[in-house]
C-alpha cells in the first residue's frame, strides 16, 4: 500500500520491484492492481495455471485508503484517530461512490 507508519515506503526503504525479487528466487510472480477484484481473481487463475512446480505469488499494488480520498491523500494514514468530522467525511465519500454504482 506504499506506506508504513513513519512515511512512504520509498522514503523509508525502497523495495523496488517486489515481483521481480520473487522471480529472481524462482517464483512465478504476478503484479496486479490491489483494488481491482476482477483483475485479482484473474491473476489468481494465472498464477495457478502457470506456476507449474514453482511457488507462486500474487503482488497486489494497492493504495492505503483507496476509494476514500480524505484518507488516501493523508501522508501519515497508517494509524489515525477517527473523530466524528473525519468519519462523516469518509462516510459521505463512500455514500457518493455507492450512489454512483
Regions found by a protein language model. Give the residues of each.
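Glycine-rich ThDP/TPP pyrophosphate-binding loop and its adjacent helix/strand module
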Residues: 1-101
Amino acid at each position: 500500500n506504499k506506506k508504513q507508519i513513519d512515511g512512504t515506503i520509498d522514503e523509508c526503504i525502497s523495495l523496488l520491484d517486489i515481483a521481480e525479487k520473487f522471480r529472481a528466487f524462482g517464483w512465478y510472480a504476478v503484479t496486479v492492481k490491489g483494488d481491482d477484484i476482477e483483475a485479482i481473481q484473474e491473476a489468481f487463475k494465472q498464477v495457478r495455471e502457470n506456476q507449474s512446480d514453482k511457488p507462486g505469488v500474487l503482488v497486489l499494488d494497492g493504495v492505503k485508503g483507496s476509494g476514500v480520498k480524505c484518507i488516501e491523500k493523508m501522508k501519515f494514514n497508517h494509524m489515525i484517530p477517527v473523530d466524528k468530522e473525519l468519519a462523516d467525511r469518509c462516510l459521505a465519500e463512500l455514500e457518493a461512490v455507492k450512489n454512483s454504482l
